């Protein structure tokens, strides 16, 4: 069963809030999605104004990004969290009814 795009965005926002210094490769690995899909998702989130990306020098030869949720991103994550919890409660109730049969 494929995840909805909102689920991917919710998971990316959650991981970024937990660790703004996470690398794209680590984030993609943790979320079990391709690097290309993650890049697409990050561009979408940035385009919606939900995250900011800033460069910083990890060492003198390599730049890394830091990902920060904007106030709009924090509000969107809260909304997605509520929707996710409602979905899980609905699934729980359906499974509970199924088991009672």
What are these regions (language model features)?
Residues 75-101:
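Amphipathic alpha-helical dimerization/coiled-coil segments
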Residues 29, 46:
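Alpha-helical residues within the helix-turn-helix
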Residues 10-14:
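Pre-recognition alpha-helix immediately N-terminal to the DNA-recognition helix
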Residues 25, 36:
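Key DNA-contact positions within bacterial/archaeal DNA-binding proteins
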Residues 2-9, 23, 54-77:
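Short, cationic-aromatic polyanion-contact patches
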